[in-house]
Amino acid sequence: MSVMDALFLLATEEVGHFGINTNLLETNVINLAILIGVLVYFGRGVLGKTLGDRQKQIATAIAEAEERQKVAAARLAEAQQKLTQAKQEAQRIREDALTRAKAVKEEIIAQAKREIERLQETASQDTSAATERAIAEIRERIAAMALAEAENQLKARLSQNPDLQRTLIDRSIALLGGK
């Protein structure tokens, strides 16, 4: 006996005649049973299809979410790798800058030492040249003073002794090719 037959029998009266039951409590239970039976019988396919479609949508959404999670994880790994590379590059640049700074510092110090040595040598040469010029100037002054003193003494002797003056003039003429 099928569900429909059972429902049909419930709808009949005791006597066997088909009729309407006026008892509300019995009719509600019967109506609910009929409704549930109809829904189960006819709604099984629709409900199964709807639940199947919903299950497919959920599975698709889960698969898409997993794929997005994989893509996000790959992007995160790539970003972390780039960050690591950037940190390594920054460290390398820092080390290069320190190396260059040391080299430039050493070059500047060496250049300053060379400049100091050159200035000291130039100062030494200038001092030597100034000393030589001073010595030469002192020699010239001493020579000029000695000549002036010799002239003064010669004039004094010549003015005191006129014969000596004549003798000196005669010798000078003889030296020049005179008598």
From Swiss-Prot:
Superkingdom of the source species: Bacteria
Pfam families assigned to the protein according to its UniProt record, in alphabetical order: ATP-synt_B
Transmembrane segments: 29-48
Membrane topology: Single-pass membrane protein
Subcellular location(s) of the protein: Cellular thylakoid membrane
Gene Ontology cellular-component terms listed: plasma membrane-derived thylakoid membrane; proton-transporting ATP synthase complex
Keywords: ATP synthesis, CF(0), Hydrogen ion transport, Ion transport, Membrane, Thylakoid, Transmembrane, Transmembrane helix, Transport
InterPro entries per the UniProt record, alphabetical: ATP_synth_B-like_membr_sf, ATP_synth_b/b'su_bac/chlpt, ATP_synth_F0_bsu_bac
GO molecular function: proton-transporting ATP synthase activity, rotational mechanism
Primary localization: membrane
Function of the molecule: F(1)F(0) ATP synthase produces ATP from ADP in the presence of a proton or sodium gradient. F-type ATPases consist of two structural domains, F(1) containing the extramembraneous catalytic core and F(0) containing the membrane proton channel, linked together by a central stalk and a peripheral stalk. During catalysis, ATP synthesis in the catalytic domain of F(1) is coupled via a rotary mechanism of the central stalk subunits to proton translocation. Component of the F(0) channel, it forms part of the peripheral stalk, linking F(1) to F(0).
Subunit structure and binding partners: F-type ATPases have 2 components, F(1) - the catalytic core - and F(0) - the membrane proton channel. F(1) has five subunits: alpha(3), beta(3), gamma(1), delta(1), epsilon(1). F(0) has four main subunits: a(1), b(1), b'(1) and c(10-14). The alpha and beta chains form an alternating ring which encloses part of the gamma chain. F(1) is attached to F(0) by a central stalk formed by the gamma and epsilon chains, while a peripheral stalk is formed by the delta, b and b' chains.
Sequence similarity: Belongs to the ATPase B chain family.
Protein name listed in UniProt: ATP synthase subunit b
Native source species: Thermosynechococcus vestitus (strain NIES-2133 / IAM M-273 / BP-1)
Organism ancestry: Bacteria, Bacillati, Cyanobacteriota, Cyanophyceae, Acaryochloridales
